[in-house]
A protein has these predicted regions:
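Solvent-exposed, charged helical/coil patches
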Residues: 1-68, 180-183, 187-190, 194
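Well-ordered, non-membrane alpha-helical segments in soluble/globular domains
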Residues: 26-33, 116-121, 151
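Short helix-loop-beta junction
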Residues: 36-43, 124-132
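Active-site metal-binding core of divalent-cation-utilizing nuclease and nuclease-like domains
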Residues: 44-100
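Conserved catalytic cores of phosphodiester-cleaving nucleases, focusing on short active-site segments
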Residues: 89-91, 102-108, 126
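Basic, glycine-rich
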Residues: 98-102, 128-194
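Short acidic, S/G/P-rich loop/turn micro-motifs used as interaction or catalytic elements
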Residues: 109-113, 141-144
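Mg2+/Mn2+-dependent nuclease catalytic core
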Residues: 113-129
């Protein structure tokens, strides 16, 4: 303690102490908790802290798939990304090396409402690299999992009458979209991982 006394910082209370240096926001911490909770409803799902080399993150096992989820990843020209971006998380596939890593952003309205154009440009640059998939989750996406709320899913068919959906999807060999129509963005992500 004496050797480090010049580095000691006074704080008002313990709430001022960051619990995990791996996440930069409360929403990111909630995302981890929501991922663990949603995973409990699945067979063969695990999310636990782990080191990969010198990097701290989480090991995720979902069915036969394995991922290392790394927080706070800078994506730039080295990754083929033309506009610098700092991803909240990247899920790096460990088993299926042909699978693209999934870049995850957790976007709370308070911090992103004035930068939608910038966020969109960054994410489009990540997609344009051809190296990654991009997933965005809102505060509500995460909070609904934590509160076990069912959500009104997006209308993937833009008002198309139900009786026309199956023939339409059959024509384009996309029947699996029928299963997705009643899921939230968070559920899509977990199912994608599984």
């Amino acid at each position: 303690i004496r050797e480090q006394q010049d580095n000691i910082i006074a704080i008002d209370n313990l709430r001022a102490v960051t619990i995990s240096p791996l996440v930069e926001s409360e929403l990111e911490a909630r995302f981890i908790e929501a991922l663990k909770r949603m995973g409990k409803s699945l067979e063969n799902f695990e999310c636990r802290p782990e080191f990969k080399g010198t990097k701290a993150g989480w090991f995720i096992r979902s069915g036969e798939h394995r991922y290392f989820m790394e927080p706070q990843v800078d994506l730039n020209a080295e990754h083929g990304v033309s506009i610098f971006s700092r991803a909240d998380f990247v899920l790096w596939p460990l088993v299926n090396k042909a699978a693209k890593p999934i870049v995850i952003f957790t976007d709370g309205f308070q911090y992103h409402k004035d930068r939608v154009d910038r966020d969109s440009a960054q994410r489009l640059a990540i997609v344009a690299s051809g190296e990654f998939l991009v997933w965005s989750l809102s505060y509500d996406d995460v909070q609904n999992v934590l509160e076990s709320k069912s959500v009104e899913p997006l209308d993937l068919f833009f008002g198309m009458p139900k009786e026309k959906r199956q023939p339409f999807l059959t024509k384009f060999q996309s029947l699996e979209l029928l299963e997705l129509q009643n899921q939230s963005s968070f559920q899509y992500l977990v199912n994608w991982l599984h």
